[in-house]
Amino acid sequence: MKKTICLWALLLIVVSCTNDDNYNDEHGDKAVIPPKGRIIRIMTYNIYGARATSPANAADLDALAEVIRRQDPDFVTLNEVDVFTNRTGKDVHQARDLAAKLGMEWHFSKAIDRDGGEYGDAVLSKHPIIETRSYRLPCAASQPGEDRSLCVIRVEIDGKDLYV
């Protein structure tokens, strides 16, 4: 009897571990697994408004660009990005300026107004960006705090759509 139960349990585990290369999410978007052998490097980086790289707390995009360059990612997701703020410069768009230093494309998603400018998240891409989406993620009234954002891009790699 124990042997039969163990065999059924093993069969259930094997059946539940089937490998489906594609699936649809609740919006009908298809997630694509890249072809075997293709490595895609994704880096996430909380840049703290680019202030954490300098002892004087001044924005240092060159230092951030060097950190990213050494990792050689295909995509970089950035958190705490300043755009035209007083604290990091009214002419500084951190996502745009970092992308230019790295030869990448970019998309910025605003979360909130901050210090005379905007503050949010961004994605940098070595691959041409086909589509961009931005989502505001407001805090619940019962749990007040700082609103967040979600930044999504669509690129094509080897003839397949990839969302980052």
Question: What role is predicted for each listed range?
Answer:
Residues 1-4, 19:
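Positively charged n-region of N-terminal signal peptides that target proteins for export
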Residues 39-52, 133-135, 152, 161-164:
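Active-site-proximal beta-strand elements of phosphoester/diester hydrolases
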Residues 17-106, 112-121:
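N-terminal, active-site-proximal structural segment of metallo-dependent hydrolase catalytic domains
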Residues 11, 70-72, 126:
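Alpha-helix termination/capping residues and helix-transition junctions
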Residues 128-162:
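Active-site catalytic loop in hydrolytic enzyme cores
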Residues 4-14:
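Sec-dependent N-terminal signal peptides
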Residues 100-101, 117-132, 156:
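Conserved beta strand-loop-helix elements of the APE1-like EEP
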